[in-house]
Amino acid sequence: MLFPFLFWYGTWFGRKLSDSEITEYLNNAAAKPRKAQHALVQMGEHISRGDTRVQQWYPKVVELSENPSLELRQTDAWLMGQDHTYQPFHEALRKLLVDSAPMVRRNAALSLTNFGDPAGRGELLAMLHPYTISTPVAGTVKYRLKIGEYVNPGTLVGRVGTEEIRSPIPGEVLGLKKRDGAEVRAGEPLVELSADKEHAWEALRGLLRVGQKQDLDDVQRYARGVAGMPDRVRRQAALTLQEIRSRAQ
């Protein structure tokens, strides 16, 4: 799953929480979302150890899938994929496939593969392709990066008028779609990002479970090797290709 971030604004999520702290943090998510995120991370560790006590908080986890905090929804989508036996998680994840944030949608799509649900296939395939950042407003564009630079979620890519434009996902800048200083309309493309190697790898792992015959061209492209991608991505693509073909027979 796309959960490499154990730090958030200087908070270390490795500190072990008591059951009462987990309850407190989840119940106070509106005021202190990063503490709630800490609790979700701890719950994931409980699930991985087969600790059924964690089930007492499952209804709250479903509730948090509608929290306004992007980071919290992203973590929530990751966590709900850790227990495919709880049907309300399945239902909440399907709703997150239309979330406004790409990172939330991607984690939801990956988590759904643990339920054997292919509903997020479109999102998984999108993770194998470049991503375009568009402007939500009209105005004069001023870029803050160059072609070839790498961005992470939240990186400032530029401004349109006074509006900050930040990248919602990681990737390398493949192209700047407008001339610096140009006037742009709301909805126009600004930056094209490459597929991220970790996102591509996770998408291929997800497609191994739910990929279909019509996905073979995208997977085969990675199996042949894509410039800038590590060999483990190519190897994963080969495994995914083999599994999809075996299902299609």
PLM features per residue range, with description:
Residues W12-N27, R49-E66, T85-V98, D117-P130, ...:
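Amphipathic alpha-helical scaffolding segments comprising HEAT/armadillo-like alpha-solenoid repeats
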Residues M43-G50, M80-T85, L112, G116, ...:
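Alpha-solenoid repeat junctions
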Residues R34-Q82, Y86:
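Extracytoplasmic/periplasmic/luminal assembly and interaction segments
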Residues A36-A39, D76, A108, A203, ...:
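Conserved hydrophobic register position within alpha-solenoid helical repeats
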Residues Y143-N152, L176-E188:
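Acidic, glycine-anchored pre-beta loop/turn
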Residues A30-K32, P68-S69, S100-A101, T132, ...:
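Short inter-helical turns and helix N-cap capping residues of alpha-solenoid HEAT/ARM repeat scaffolds
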Residues D117, L128-V141, T155-G175, E192-L193:
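Short beta-strand-turn/beta-hairpin segments enriched in glycine/proline and small hydrophobics
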